[in-house]
Design a protein with these regions (language model features):
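N-terminal glycine-rich FAD/FM-binding segment characteristic of electron-transfer flavoproteins
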Residues: 1-172
Length: 172
């Protein structure tokens, strides 16, 4: 089972500055880390690979320094890493980010599942995952707390809702 995991390198501090001309984060001199929610997604992708075979492809859109997060993903068990980097991507909103990631996933082609972290700690929007699924025309489930079973081209997940949990089964 081939799993794509979308990851992002984020500032490792809450003390960030914004460039007033470009409205983008000034990343120089700020320690960066792998987004914690993406680390959970990566861990789940590796677990799926260990149980079902296949490979994990970590993908990130960001500046050249985002290679550090991808190297961390390889160390954590990803088999391949892809960095999508271009100055034109600087300051991209979630719609642009999900579009670029969707084009990359379409080019990869050979995947069974795409996992995204719940949200990034630098934006907190949680929009890239659903927008990515919409761009690719694939099912999407938010707030998954556990993948209960994967078999015969389907997956059963448990997701958090206000009143507790909901179990959903879907085709892959």
């Amino acid at each position: 089972m081939n799993v794509v995991v979308c990851i992002k390198q984020v500032p490792g501090t809450t003390e960030v500055a914004i460039d007033p001309q470009t409205n983008t984060l000034i990343r120089e001199g700020v320690k960066s880390i792998l987004n914690p929610f993406d680390a959970y997604a990566l861990e789940e992708g590796v677990r799926i690979k260990e149980q079902h075979g296949g490979k994990v492809i970590a993908i990130s859109m960001g500046p050249p320094q985002a290679e550090e997060a991808l190297r961390e993903a390889i160390t954590a068990g990803a088999d391949e890493a892809i960095l999508l980097s271009d100055r034109a991507f600087a300051g991209s909103d979630t719609l642009a980010t999900s579009y670029v990631l969707a084009k990359a996933c379409a080019k990869i082609g050979d995947y069974d599942l795409i996992i995204c972290g719940r949200q990034t700690i630098d934006g907190d929007t949680g929009q890239v995952g659903p927008e990515l699924a919409e761009n690719l025309g694939i099912p999407f489930v938010a707030y998954v707390s556990k993948i209960e079973e994967i078999k015969d081209g389907s997956m059963r997940v448990r997701r958090m809702i206000e009143e507790g949990y909901e179990v959903i089964e879907m085709s892959l």
